[in-house]
A protein has these predicted regions:
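Pyridoxal 5′-phosphate
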Residues: 1-133
Length: 133
């Protein structure tokens, strides 16, 4: 694996910060995108944008199909049993809140323990902290 070659796919890493190469360590919050993703997002917003699952007009149906086809692609990529196991969230914080709330409401009981390390990102500490109250 050639890290330099992979890094060249990400336009953000062409930027310099005070004459130094950019180092980005907050991908759990916001992931940098390779150019191919930026181009595809731009194409979607320029030519295909519509709400997903909210209407029956052409653009809405096309956007919904694209969304569901993406769910199927992810299912195959991670070898999930069913495409409905795939849940898209806006980021790690929303995903961790969702997991904590589902486990808290449906599975965890008084006396159960959830172990996390002191090294956890704040987004993984807060949902469990609130859950214990």
């Amino acid at each position: 694996m050639n890290i330099d070659k992979i890094k060249k796919e990400f336009p953000i890493f062409d930027e310099k910060i005070q004459n130094n190469d950019l180092v980005y360590l907050d991908s759990a919050n916001s992931s940098q995108k390779p150019k191919v993703v930026i181009d595809r997002i731009n194409e979607f917003y320029s030519k295909e944008f519509s709400n997903v699952g909210r209407s029956v007009h052409y653009l809405a149906v096309a956007a919904t199909n694209l969304y569901e086809n993406t769910r199927t692609s992810v299912q195959k990529f991670i070898n999930a049993k069913d495409k409905n196991e795939i849940v898209f969230t806006k980021g790690a914080t929303e995903a961790l809140n969702l997991v904590a709330n589902i486990l808290g409401q449906n599975y965890l009981q008084d006396g159960d323990e959830v172990l996390i390390t002191e090294l956890e990102h704040h987004s993984n500490y807060v949902p469990w902290h609130f859950l214990r109250k």
